[in-house]
A protein has these predicted regions:
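N-terminal anchoring/stem segment of glycosyltransferases
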Residues: 1-90, 260-269, 274-325
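Conserved donor-nucleotide/metal-binding helix-loop-beta segment in metal-dependent transferases, i.e.
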Residues: 124-156
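Short, flexible, basic/aromatic active-site loop/helix in glycosyltransferases
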Residues: 155-167
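Short glycine/proline-enriched coil/turn segments at helix->beta-strand junctions
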Residues: 52-56, 107-114, 131-134
Length: 326
């Protein structure tokens, strides 16, 4: 039996409201706020999978994010919608650098145990070993590179005392992060927010450096300093320098769109094929989601595909997901 741990989806629209698309290449866009088709599909799957394996799911967002969820009918995915992230607008946290600051802020609002799960990641099986406590995250990533430079080279313009924590591990990818120790949760959340606040001045480092440090270096460093057990969901290791994976596949554990986003922007003609993959995976595992998908206005362009995948699954089962990997 899997340990019951509630999860949060976090959607801070601050980056959009600052004129920034929610992707790592920082391409500007105009127009109303919205989530791309593929992210809506993974969001639906993410909420249903977590609920099936581990427990309830809440959305922590702001007024714009809550309005969007309601307009799309996605509010039905959640036990509760909390607009606490409106308070981020009053803080000196630059959304152009800290596009995921909502996750750190949300971690201040709940006591452990709970998980923060990105809307572009869904589980395919329960997360193992949650009863052991500690801090669980998606996977390790290499450090000592342009994304994760040595700690002394990271911009720290607010003067946060980083010597309090032990930076002797790789970076912890936090597309899924499970906080099972409340001391770790509280100290990490405060440290992450303190690092981000007032820390947006000029620097020779890549823009991504500050956001990744605020989460994926600080969280494991705090765990190490407290003696809190930390471990990845998968032993698969992301080598930042070569953008390659090392180690066993995580396909049986979770699916994460992140590494496909750049390809989908570069080759938009691939998006319908990826939608089919996501739809087959979702509708095979959670067939009851089909009616919700057909009711979401932002999914209108793939409504015929939803119907076709439902028919194909009913006729002969899945054709893609059994042999596909993330």
């Amino acid at each position: 039996v899997s340990l019951t741990v509630p999860a949060l989806h976090v959607n801070w629209t601050g980056p959009h409201r600052a004129g920034l698309r929610r992707h790592r290449d920082r391409v500007l866009e105009n127009g109303p706020y919205g989530m791309p088709v593929e992210e809506i599909l993974t969001c639906v799957h993410s909420a249903h999978a977590w609920r099936a394996f581990h427990g309830g799911v809440e959305l922590v967002t702001d007024e714009l994010g809550a309005s969007y969820a309601a307009a799309q009918g996605l509010d039905a995915l959640y036990d509760r919608i909390d607009t606490a992230l409106d308070a981020l607008d009053a803080l000196d946290v630059d959304p152009l650098f800290y596009f995921a600051a909502g996750k750190s802020y949300a971690a201040r609002l709940r006591a452990a145990p709970f998980a923060v799960v990105d809307t572009d990641l869904y589980l395919r099986r329960p997360v193992d070993g949650l009863e052991r406590g500690g801090f669980v995250f998606a996977h390790w990533e290499s450090v000592g590179n342009a994304v994760y430079p040595p700690v002394p080279e990271v911009p720290n313009q607010a003067g946060l005392d980083l010597s309090r924590w032990t930076f002797d591990t790789p970076a912890a990818n936090m597309a899924v992060s499970v906080f099972l120790d409340d001391r770790h949760r509280a100290e990490y959340a405060e440290a992450s927010m303190a690092f981000m606040t007032g820390n947006a001045g000029p620097s020779d480092t890549a823009p991504i450096v500050r956001q990744t440090f605020a989460e994926q270096r600080i969280a494991p460093a705090v765990a190490r300093s407290l003696g809190v057990d930390l471990r990845p969901v998968t032993e698969r290791f992301w080598i930042v320098e070569t953008e390659e994976w090392d180690g066993p596949s995580y396909a049986d554990r979770f699916h994460h769109t992140w590494n496909q986003k750049r390809l989908l922007r570069q080759f938009p003609e691939l998006r319908p094929a990826y939608w089919r993959y996501l739809l087959e995976d979702l509708l095979w595992r959670f067939p009851g989601t089909g009616d919700l998908l057909l009711s979401v206005p932002a999914l209108k362009e793939c409504a015929d595909l939803v119907r076709a995948v439902r028919r194909d699954l009913a006729a002969h089962g899945p054709s893609l997901i059994e042999r596909s990997t993330p």
